[in-house]
């Protein structure tokens, strides 16, 4: 595949006017059949973007644009125009299916060029928008642009969107209704990664039940470092059955909670032929009973599991179940459990609270208030129509 790259050269391109500057792009100028252009790791000003735009627009065979980290050191007023020029050129590339714009400090100021491009570029299949500082308002507008893209794709019978990588963008709960609509409108997605976006339980619930549960061809889902608690975990437990092709599930640092993790593991236990290859569950307050159930699920229903991450949870690396999980992998001749070197220990106060709760519940013949609340929540979630 013909590829042009100046990756990582740390060039400060304010304008491309001298012969030395143009010589850097000589190969690009000569190759009309180039399929991939990599500009990452350089800083591009407005006039340089104008020159590049004029020359990129003619590359009708271009398939991949790697434009991550191309505005370091640029003032916020300069970035929108430079971005607009580059994206206008990409709109003229009919085979361009992969666009990487990560690690650019767009913030809210550069949202308009993005919105215009994302709503119009129907060949798009793989979008990388990671660490762009969007915030919830700009994030919601980006989501609406992708909804418009779905309409335009359908009108042109264009290939479906397959990947959305949009992490570290402070999307928060405020944009989740729009993102849920986006996932409803792009139901053939294979990969969704929305890590570290400050999404809290109510937003997670909406995202899962009103959005991602509709994406039944999903293979990779990564929501690490958002906050689930029992509410979000219960929604995940419902949604799991919607993804029969899921191969990777990333839930590290999601605060599933003991009850939430138990609900997720219980949901796994009710599925058949689980094709997961990677399951990341670090730092989620998972307790021993849930791990025991998970071991049984892995043994009986996850024959393809290769990577399991459980560090930072509420059980000991000395517990028998840890050796039992490793024995399952050893017997198969494949599979790996991460190092359990940072396990969380319950404080004396937490242990006393749990003992008191258990003692107070055990003699009660009637349903406790907590159980009533759990049942009401389960009933409410079960009404969600997918």
UniProtKB/Swiss-Prot annotation:
An example of a GO molecular function for this protein is:
GTPase activator activity
Is the keyword Repeat assigned to this protein? yes
Gene3D superfamilies assigned: Ribonuclease Inhibitor
Q: Which InterPro entries match?
A: LRR_dom_sf, RanGap
Q: Name one GO biological process term.
A: nuclear export
In terms of SMART domains, this protein maps to:
LRR_RI
Record-annotated membrane-spanning stretches? none
Q: Which residue positions hold the site described Critical residue for GTP hydrolysis?
A: 74
Q: Where is this region: Disordered?
A: 333-386
User: Repeat LRR: residue ranges?
Assistant: 23-48, 85-112, 113-141, 179-206, 207-235, 236-264, 265-293, 294-322
Keyword Repeat set for record: yes
The Gene Ontology CC terms held by the record are: cytoplasm; cytosol; nuclear periphery; nucleus; perinuclear region of cytoplasm
What SUPFAM superfamilies does the record tag this protein with? RNI-like (SSF52047)
Q: Which family does it belong to?
A: Belongs to the RNA1 family.
Q: Subunit details for this protein? A: Monomer.
Q: What is this protein called?
A: Ran GTPase-activating protein 1
What species is this protein from? Schizosaccharomyces pombe (strain 972 / ATCC 24843)
């Amino acid at each position: 595949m013909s590829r042009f790259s100046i990756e990582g050269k740390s060039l400060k391109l304010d304008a491309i006017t001298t012969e030395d500057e143009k010589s850097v792009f000589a190969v690009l100028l000569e190759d009309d059949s180039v399929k991939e252009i990599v500009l990452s790791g350089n800083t591009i000003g407005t006039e340089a973007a104008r020159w590049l735009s004029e020359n990129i627009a003619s590359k009708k065979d271009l398939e991949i644009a790697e434009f991550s980290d191309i505005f370091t050191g640029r003032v916020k007023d300069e970035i929108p125009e430079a971005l607009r020029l580059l994206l206008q050129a990409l709109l003229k590339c009919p085979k361009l299916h992969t666009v990487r714009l990560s690690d650019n400090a767009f913030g809210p100021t550069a949202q308009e060029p993005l919105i215009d491009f994302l709503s119009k570029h129907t060949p798009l299949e793989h979008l990388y928008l990671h660490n762009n500082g969007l915030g919830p308002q700009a994030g919601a507008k980006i989501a609406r642009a992708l909804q418009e893209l779905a309409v335009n794709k359908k009108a042109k019978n264009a290939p479906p969107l397959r990947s959305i990588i949009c992490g570290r963008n402070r999307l928060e709960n405020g944009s989740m209704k729009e993102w849920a609509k986006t996932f409803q409108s792009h139901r053939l997605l294979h990969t969704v990664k929305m890590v570290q976006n400050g999404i809290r339980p109510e937003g997670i619930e909406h995202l899962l039940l009103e959005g991602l549960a509709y994406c039944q061809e999903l293979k990779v889902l990564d929501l690490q470092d958002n906050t689930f608690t029992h509410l979000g975990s219960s929604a995940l437990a419902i949604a799991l059955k919607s993804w029969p092709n899921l191969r990777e599930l990333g839930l590290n640092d999601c605060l599933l909670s003991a009850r939430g993790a138990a609900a997720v593991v219980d949901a796994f236990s009710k599925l058949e032929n689980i094709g997961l290859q990677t399951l990341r569950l670090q730092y989620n307050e998972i307790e021993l009973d849930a791990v025991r159930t998970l071991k049984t699920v892995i043994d009986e229903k996850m024959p393809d599991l290769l990577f399991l991450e459980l560090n930072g949870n509420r059980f000991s690396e000395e517990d028998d179940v840890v050796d039992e999980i490793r024995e399952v992998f050893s017997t198969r001749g494949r599979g790996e459990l991460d190092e359990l070197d940072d396990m969380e220990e319950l404080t004396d106060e937490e242990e006393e609270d749990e003992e008191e709760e258990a003692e107070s519940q055990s003699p009660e013949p009637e349903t406790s208030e907590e159980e009533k609340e759990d049942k009401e929540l389960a009933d409410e979630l079960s009404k969600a129509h997918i």
